[in-house]
Amino acid sequence: MSSKVINQELKEAIQRKGMTQVTLSKGTFRAKTTINGYFRGDPAPVEAMEDMATYLDDSLFSQDMSHKVFSVIPPMRSDVYQQSPHTLDIIHKLETEERKSRKNRAMLLLTKNSEALTEQDKEEILDYALNFLDEVFIETRCIVSILEKVNLSLMSAVQQRVPHWKRQKYMGGE
């Protein structure tokens, strides 16, 4: 994996955390000049991004790094909508209604054998899945927004919840 420029994401993360470059340097066991270089725009290697994400324990920064390095789901930010739990819940409800309006048709289509699906059927199933993805994406951002109120990152919350999910048999493992 290659190094990436992350100066803007770092600036936003330490501002959210009320932290300084020196604190980040000490917490990640990296030279102050190295950390300062990342803030100036020097590319950061993947290992450094991982260490900083772990130390910062900031959901948006972690999502930013995952997106930059692995091209996974980007963090949701909007220049139009507030990122408050209330606003995100309203948007989530709208997305849920939109998905539900497509659900019955999609569920019927999903009962067909794959070879019997027409191109139109596949488009309707894809439309349903994409609307479902909208809903999940917004719901995830809503959870992050709620967790920010109690100063907990999404990853920390997931780590806390894994034992419960295992007891419920939602996931395997010891």
Q: Where do the PLM segments sit?
A:
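DNA major-groove recognition helix of helix-turn-helix/homeodomain DNA-binding modules
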Residues: 47-63
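The alpha-helix within a helix-turn-helix
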Residues: 14, 25, 53
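Recognition helix of helix-turn-helix/homeodomain-like DNA-binding domains
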Residues: 29-44
